[in-house]
Amino acid sequence: MESGDQAGETSKKKKKGPYMSWSDQECYELTAILVDAIKRGWRDKNGTISKTTVERKILPLLNKKFKCNKTYTNYLSRMKSMKKEYSVYAALFWFSSGFGWDPITKQFTAPDDVWAAYLMGHPNHHHMRTSTFEDFEDLQLIFESAIAKGNNAFGLGGDSNAETFEEEDDLQAGDNVNHMEINDDEVNETLPKEKLPTRKRSKTNRNGDRSDSINHGESSEKVLSEMIGVGTNIINLIQQREERHQREVEFRETEKKKNNVWDAIKEIPDLEDHIRYDAVTKIHTLNLKDVFVSMSVEERLGWIRRNT
């Protein structure tokens, strides 16, 4: 049995293929190609780039420029690293609504008290406050739409290998959701099937005169009425999508505020900063975030006085 297990493990390792490193120039070029691909509309309606598109359009450009032989497996490995990098950036905005982005300096911004609270829980992230991040906007463009739609990353559709690439879908952030995109399939499924009236062939009477069995004026009016009905249905569908999009945005904002420990602490008046910082650390250590934010302001104050 042991030899069989070892053989199975060996075969799994062989499936992964040889490891191929990525140079800085290759990483930069892949990001640039993906950004250009998005602008060209190479994503499908789910917000992802399919395996076929990656293999036929993206990797050939990269391999030709650097005279390398990157495969789809290598691409997935690099995408995993890129999404891990982006998740660190996105975590700032989930920690507190006080974080922002300066597109000129390419730096993350926040008030001093927000940075202090964040760095208390992330002592190894001091560089996030002072460093510049040239690739943030590109990574945001690459990953935000796919994440918001519930997909893992580009090229991770049904034809991808789950063993090769395992993603944690913790991040559901981002308001850059293409809710206003209406595709033909959705319209066809939502609208009733309208059948235009069949025009019957003319009949010939005994005198040889041809007369239409359907009055042409009435037929044209009916067709026009049906076309107006279809147009009205499309307009109603668009309005419904807009309303749903607005509700989803408001819901995410509400959830974001509800789950923000630091904002919940700042609602408590007359607390010194060092007590606030200690409270943040204590709450995260005890994994009591959900309980704490569900308390009233008075209950939060009582909890802090008792536990800090």
Swiss-Prot record:
Region (Disordered): 158-221
InterPro entries, sorted: At2g29880-like (IPR055314), At2g29880-like_C (IPR056253), Myb/SANT-like_dom (IPR024752)
Protein name per Swiss-Prot or TrEMBL: Uncharacterized protein At2g29880
Biased composition (Basic and acidic residues): 206-221
